[in-house]
Amino acid sequence: MTTTTEFPSATAKARFVRVSPRKARRVIDLVRGRSVSDALDILRWAPQAASEPVAKVIASAAANAQNNNGLDPATLIVATVYADEGPTAKRIRPRAQGRAFRIRKRTSHITVVVESRPSKDQRSSKSSRARRAEGSKAAATAPAKKSSASKAPAKKAATKAESKTSETSEAKGGSD
């Protein structure tokens, strides 16, 4: 699977890892889209056994980005990460009365693509100006909508309110 990205990237693969792909995906979902340093911190404290091989692959992809492509490790983000199914080793567990159960020892291929994306502080000033302009346009149109949205109360509600006030005034006046 080849993916083209607009940012410079690096890839790392771990093949035939003795972890079920389903269990690896559970760990992978924790780190997808995060920075490499955050992902490694999360995986360091994750209790799942699959977190160790996933962390190794992410660290390898970061090292590839730094050494092969000359990318800054601080700007690396885990852009794409997935676990495909590898070959399954079949074993036999003897059971009672001559039976045998099949055990499937599943393997997975873990692939990580890290991208060097600029942090929010390093974005171009032009794009931030454009965002501010859009925000001011939205703010300018918002009050105009509010003024047109105010409506008069419904006739039925207005007549009920008037009748209640007249009843209370009559009750007060009649008791004097």
Curated annotation (Swiss-Prot):
Signal sequence interval, chain numbering: none
Keywords on record: Ribonucleoprotein, Ribosomal protein, RNA-binding, rRNA-binding
GO BP annotations listed: translation
UniProt cross-references to InterPro entries, sorted A to Z: Ribosomal_uL22 (IPR001063), Ribosomal_uL22_bac/chlpt-type (IPR005727), Ribosomal_uL22_bac/org-type (IPR047867), Ribosomal_uL22_CS (IPR018260), Ribosomal_uL22_sf (IPR036394)
Superkingdom, taxonomy of origin: Bacteria
Region (Disordered): 113-176
Single GO molecular function: rRNA binding
Low complexity composition-biased segments: 136-152
Stored CDD domains: Ribosomal_L22
Bias (Basic and acidic residues): 159-176
GO cellular component, as recorded: cytosolic large ribosomal subunit
Family annotation (Gene3D superfamilies): Ribosomal protein L22/L17
Keyword hit for Transmembrane: no
Description of how the protein assembles with itself and partners: Part of the 50S ribosomal subunit.
Family to which the UniProt record says this protein belongs: Belongs to the universal ribosomal protein uL22 family.
NCBIfam families to which the protein is assigned, alphabetical: rplV_bact
Function of the protein: This protein binds specifically to 23S rRNA; its binding is stimulated by other ribosomal proteins, e.g. L4, L17, and L20. It is important during the early stages of 50S assembly. It makes multiple contacts with different domains of the 23S rRNA in the assembled 50S subunit and ribosome. The globular domain of the protein is located near the polypeptide exit tunnel on the outside of the subunit, while an extended beta-hairpin is found that lines the wall of the exit tunnel in the center of the 70S ribosome.
Protein name: Large ribosomal subunit protein uL22
Gene name of the record: rplV
